[in-house]
């Protein structure tokens, strides 16, 4: 047995330590200050406790400033929360408490569920425990001991967890002072290293193991950060997100609603449907000349889905359709389509295709349905029925790179038109389980890697790029487009996916220049992804203050006095003739009341007309969110607003025509 271990440090230096030396020993050998700051170590990239003996490999000393420390801080905070709960409410059972995105939670079994009023009490107790600065220590228990100890404590959920751990796997128990829990670890050195930048966020119900047949538990969510400034910033973003919640704004703006009889499907109101159609019309114009817009059936025989493979691996997420009545002559099983690609392949296959016709680009604003658990549904962001701005390009292998670049240019241009300038494009490469031979993947990944470099180069570095190893679809590599909104949240929207699978499954081919049947390359492409979700993102990004060209109601003409009503109607008609969507408000109400009311529904422009404006044939323009009013002539107002209400793609075409004439 070796009497020493060899450790390689980030600077490349190599040191030897006695066998049994811990991470803390290594940190202390470098400096006392580093040992004081250290919270954990990483050996060959795997984070471990400071108290754990080190082994040969590459070592890193992790401090609270390290990004990896954040997960440890949150993990430890979850344990401290559990201890606080059991100190305050003895007899409460602790179940599972993982770190999640932006925080942590713990599920508790308690006779009476927790309420939001309990959270400040728990936080206060957590601060006491953190101040005690008790060390985290690890023990390895036998299965029998763990079951006996937890059973004696009345922790039946822990006993069940112990039973679920595979035979031969260590049962780790972490102590913080006298309190302990079953946990894989790792943890920091002591509770004091958590700090005070934490907050408990909310309580919710949760079934044990996520199964509705099991008992209902109470889940407490929390978050924690290394620094108070980071916590404050996160809470500020949450507050902003709440103000921008598209579900609330959708109600206030009278855009849409959901109801129990149609879970996960949208009831579009007049104004909401107008925005939706504005989005569709814009996307349709962007496809002109390059794409054939098609429409594949909503309901198809399951045999098609068996051929595509969806029936085997996606059936539980599909809505099956049965024929009404027992005496029908068609007893086949049908399903609502969860995606558009199999239908588009049928359209491509209808009739012989020559290489001279490629690329063939088929686009559809296709209504699809996918089963989502009711607990996962979230306004427009997560629904069961939605519209995909889907397209499938059938091309030759040689055309693949050019098509991917063409798609990229379109996607980035669309995002820019809606005000999204920070976009990240990432290439997802081959997963472990995949179809197609390595030569196909090598070729596709090589082409897409070059495309990725071109994307970054052409943008002058404005568009960030990256690689997601192993994250590709099983049928081919893909690009993922992630945009950043006004408050810094990231939304993955667009995708470009190369597919080796479906053309082969469906026997799609074209006739090449040698009169041979050749399988085409199929590229799946979506820009918005789900049109409903993209609209939800837009509403939240703009906090309901939609650009004039997107807004469902662009102008309200409001009069100060009934003497100006005639002129107000003339103003409204002139604006309508210029192509704007206009309503009038001639009610016998004070003008400030009218302005407040229309501001709640997020009308972008209110034109105020009084006796003076009628005499001068002028208007006062008041913008949403501004107290100021701008006076101008009616003709100036019409010219200015009609220009602003023109979609950006239409403006570009006009400018291009003018430049051509000039």
UniProtKB/Swiss-Prot annotation:
Belongs to the class-II aminoacyl-tRNA synthetase family. The gene is thrS. The keyword Cytoplasm applies. Keywords: Aminoacyl-tRNA synthetase, ATP-binding, Cytoplasm, Ligase, Metal-binding, Nucleotide-binding, Protein biosynthesis, RNA-binding, tRNA-binding, Zinc. One of its GO terms (cellular component) is cytosol. It is found in: Cytoplasm. Its EC number is 6.1.1.3. This is Threonine--tRNA ligase. Homodimer. Its cofactor is Zn(2+). It catalyses: tRNA(Thr) + L-threonine + ATP = L-threonyl-tRNA(Thr) + AMP + diphosphate + H(+). Binds 1 zinc ion per subunit. Catalyzes the attachment of threonine to tRNA(Thr) in a two-step reaction: L-threonine is first activated by ATP to form Thr-AMP and then transferred to the acceptor end of tRNA(Thr). Also edits incorrectly charged L-seryl-tRNA(Thr). Pfam families: HGTP_anticodon (PF03129), TGS (PF02824), tRNA-synt_2b (PF00587), tRNA_SAD (PF07973). One of its GO terms (molecular function) is threonine-tRNA ligase activity. One of its GO terms (biological process) is threonyl-tRNA aminoacylation. Residues 1-64 form the TGS domain. Zn(2+) binds at residues 341, 392, 524. HAMAP family: Thr_tRNA_synth. Residues 245-547 are annotated as: Catalytic. It comes from Rhizobium rhizogenes (strain K84 / ATCC BAA-868).
């Amino acid at each position: 047995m070796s009497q020493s271990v060899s450790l390689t440090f980030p600077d490349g230096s190599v040191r030897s330590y006695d066998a049994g030396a811990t991470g803390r020993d290594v940190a202390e050998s470098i400096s006392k200050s580093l040992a004081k700051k250290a919270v954990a170590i990483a050996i060959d990239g795997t984070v471990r406790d400071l108290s754990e003996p080190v082994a040969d490999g590459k070592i890193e000393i992790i401090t609270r400033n390290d990004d990896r420390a954040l997960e440890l801080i949150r993990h430890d905070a979850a344990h401290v929360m559990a201890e606080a709960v059991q100190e305050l409410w003895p007899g409460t059972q602790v179940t599972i408490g993982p770190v999640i995105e932006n925080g942590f939670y713990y599920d508790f079994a308690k006779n009476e569920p927790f309420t939001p009023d309990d959270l400040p009490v728990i936080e206060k107790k957590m601060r006491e425990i953190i101040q005690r600065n008790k060390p985290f220590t690890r023990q390895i228990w036998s299965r029998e001991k763990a079951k006996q100890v937890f059973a004696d404590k009345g922790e039946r959920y822990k006993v069940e967890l112990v039973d679920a751990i595979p035979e031969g796997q260590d049962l780790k128990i972490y102590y913080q002072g006298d309190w302990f829990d079953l946990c894989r670890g790792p943890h920091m050195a002591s509770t004091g290293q958590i700090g005070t930048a934490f907050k408990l966020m909310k309580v919710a119900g949760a079934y044990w193991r996520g199964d509705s047949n099991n008992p209902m538990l109470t889940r407490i969510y929390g978050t924690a950060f290394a620094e108070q400034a980071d916590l404050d910033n996160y809470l500020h973003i949450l507050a902003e997100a709440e103000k921008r919640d598209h579900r609330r704004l959708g109600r206030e703006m009278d855009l849409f609603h959901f109801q129990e009889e149609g879970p996960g499907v949208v009831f579009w109101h007049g104004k909401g449907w107008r925005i939706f159609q504005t989005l569709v019309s814009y996307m349709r114009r962007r496809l002109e000349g390059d794409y054939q817009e098609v429409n594949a059936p909503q309901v198809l025989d399951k045999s098609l889905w068996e051929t595509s493979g969806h029936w085997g691996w996606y059936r539980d997420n599909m809505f099956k359709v049965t024929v009404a009545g027992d005496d029908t002559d068609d007893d086949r099983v049908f399903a609502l389509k969860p995606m558009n690609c199999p239908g588009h392949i049928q359209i491509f296959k209808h009739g012989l295709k020559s290489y001279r016709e490629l690329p063939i680009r088929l686009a559809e604003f296709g209504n699809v349905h996918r089963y989502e658990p009711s607990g996962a549904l979230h306004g427009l962001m997560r629904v069961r029925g939605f519209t995909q701005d889907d397209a499938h390009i059938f091309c030759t292998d040689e055309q693949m790179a050019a098509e991917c670049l063409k798609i990229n240019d379109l996607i980035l241009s669309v995002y820019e038109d809606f005000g999204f300038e920070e976009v990240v494009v990432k290439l997802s490469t081959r997963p472990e389980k995949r179809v197609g031979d390595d030569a196909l993947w090598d070729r596709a990944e090589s082409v897409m890697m070059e495309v990725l470099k071109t994307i970054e180069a052409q943008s002058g570095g404005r568009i960030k790029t990256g690689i997601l190893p192993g994250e590709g679809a099983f049928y081919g590599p893909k690009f993922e487009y992630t945009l950043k909104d006004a408050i810094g949240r990231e939304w993955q929207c667009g995708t470009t996916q190369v597919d080796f699978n479906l053309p082969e499954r469906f026997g799609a081919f074209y006739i090449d220049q040698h009169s041979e049947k050749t399988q085409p390359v199929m590229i799946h492409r979506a820009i918005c992804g789900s049109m409903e979700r993209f609209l939800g993102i837009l509403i939240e990004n703009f906090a309901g203050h939609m650009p004039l060209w997107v807004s469902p109601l662009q102008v309200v003409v409001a009069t100060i006095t009934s003497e100006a009503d005639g002129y107000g109607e003339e103003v409204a008609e002139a604006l309508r003739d210029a192509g704007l969507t206009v309503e009038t408000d001639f009610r016998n109400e004070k003008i400030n009341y009218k302005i407040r009311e229309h501001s709640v529904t997020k009308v972008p422009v209110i034109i105020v007309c009084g006796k003076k404006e009628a005499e001068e044939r002028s208007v006062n323009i008041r913008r949403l969110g501004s107290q100021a009013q701008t006076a101008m002539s009616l003709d100036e107002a019409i010219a200015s607003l009609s220009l602003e209400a023109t979609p950006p793609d239409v403006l570009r075409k006009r400018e291009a025509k003018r430049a051509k004439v000039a």
